[in-house]
Amino acid sequence: MKKTDKILKEIGIQRVAIMEGKKYSKGFMEDGDIGVQY
């Protein structure tokens, strides 16, 4: 369950980031990992 929860959380964060758009995209490109931002 934990692995699935982590994946779902990351998908949720990614979805928010897509809606937020440019606000987060630079950080994602630099880090190369969605999780690093949070």
Swiss-Prot record:
Record has Cell inner membrane as a keyword: no
Reactions performed catalytically: L-histidine + H(+) = histamine + CO2
Cofactor note: Binds 1 pyruvoyl group covalently per subunit.
Classification via InterPro entries: Pyr-dep_his-deCO2ase_N (IPR016106), Pyr-dep_his/arg-deCO2ase (IPR016104)
Listed GO biological process terms: amino acid metabolic process
An MF annotation (GO) of this entry: histidine decarboxylase activity
Keyword annotations: Decarboxylase, Lyase, Pyruvate
Cofactor: pyruvate
E.C. code: 4.1.1.22
Keyword match Transport: no
Disulfide bonds: none
EC top class named in words: lyase
Record text on subunit structure and interactions: Heterohexamer of 3 large and 3 small chains.
The protein, known as: Histidine decarboxylase small chain
